[in-house]
Amino acid sequence: MAQSTLYSRVLGTGSYLPPDRVTNQELADRLAKDGIETSDEWIVARTGIRARHFAAPDVTTSDLALVAAQRAIEAADVDPQSIDLIIVATSTPDFVFPSTACLLQNKLGIKNGGAAFDVQAVCSGFAYALATADSFIRTGQHRTALVIGAETFSRILDFKDRTTCVLFGDGAGAVVLSASEEPGILGSALHADGSYSNILCTPGNVNRGVIAGSAFLHMDGQAVFKLAVNVLEKVAVEALSKAELASEQVDWLIPHQANIRIMTSTCRKLGLPQERMIVTVDEHGNTSAASIPLALDVAVRDGRIKRGQHVLIEGVGGGFTWGASVFRF
């Protein structure tokens, strides 16, 4: 008897945004007190961002991840103790170690000894984490995975640099994947090029208990823009090829929510109508690894994304990293 093909399938989604919603005008007013000039019009014209959410000082990345995870588990209707793999994509972990995934496993009360680890690919992190979990499930090593993107980027922003501090926000998004004979994740593609590591980075490091170098995010915006628009179409086409799908078969595109100009450029290059692109950057800002699962959960819960539809996700981030996945929801 032939052995059936094993897939990983999305059972449920969840997300969480901290309650402190900061509009462009509110942020501009805060910055003006330090002599930093910006405006709602300037931010919207260049990014499409109108607001973002910031976590309170006593709230950690694992706290955000916990709420998103609980909502995804509830939507998936699974026993938390059946989750034998947790992967958290984050660049703003609670600690250098232990991993945020291990902290989350404990907060969820999961005591089954399953694997838990973090993935660090910045804004591509969720694409990396999803593809990794898919591989573990397809090879039979794990059956039920919790995959999360969670960030508190407000902690690493220089609020004297208007070119970066207006872009980012905090939040978390999660999915539960489970082994299935029914097709789910159909194809993924991941890439990196470390020669571009300096165009988007946080150059500080811990040396003998002291932070050496800057602890704030640094970005060469023009270089990031040029590289992003160049690689995103290619990696999307590669993932579609692995999934044996044409772009016109994509029901929904969920790009990393970084900049509306990058997003619309990629959508246009793929030949997709703008109406098929999920956009949350206006309300969330750039939440790095959390942006894709946040947008996914929003569109699932408002009824746009329905069972059986094909969803293409793609992201690009510091490293330089980029990746894409195609799945049937």
Swiss-Prot record:
The last Arg residue of the ACP-binding site is essential for the weak association between ACP/AcpP and FabH. CDD domains: KAS_III (cd00830). Coiled coil: none annotated. It holds the Pfam family ACP_syn_III_C. SUPFAM superfamilies: Thiolase-like (SSF53901). The keyword Transport does not apply. Its EC number is 2.3.1.180. It catalyses: malonyl-[ACP] + acetyl-CoA + H(+) = 3-oxobutanoyl-[ACP] + CO2 + CoA. Catalyzes the condensation reaction of fatty acid synthesis by the addition to an acyl acceptor of two carbons from malonyl-ACP. Catalyzes the first condensation reaction which initiates fatty acid synthesis and may therefore play a role in governing the total rate of fatty acid production. Possesses both acetoacetyl-ACP synthase and acetyl transacylase activities. Its substrate specificity determines the biosynthesis of branched-chain and/or straight-chain of fatty acids. InterPro entries: ACP_syn_III_C (IPR013747), ACP_syn_III_N (IPR013751), FabH (IPR004655), Thiolase-like (IPR016039). The active site is at residues 123, 256, 286. Its main location: cytoplasm. One of its GO terms (molecular function) is beta-ketoacyl-acyl-carrier-protein synthase III activity. Pathway: Lipid metabolism; fatty acid biosynthesis. Belongs to the thiolase-like superfamily. FabH family. GO terms for biological process: fatty acid biosynthetic process. Homodimer. Keywords: Acyltransferase, Cytoplasm, Fatty acid biosynthesis, Fatty acid metabolism, Lipid biosynthesis, Lipid metabolism, Multifunctional enzyme, Transferase. Residues 257-261 are annotated as: ACP-binding. This is Beta-ketoacyl-[acyl-carrier-protein] synthase III. GO terms for cellular component: cytoplasm. The gene is fabH.
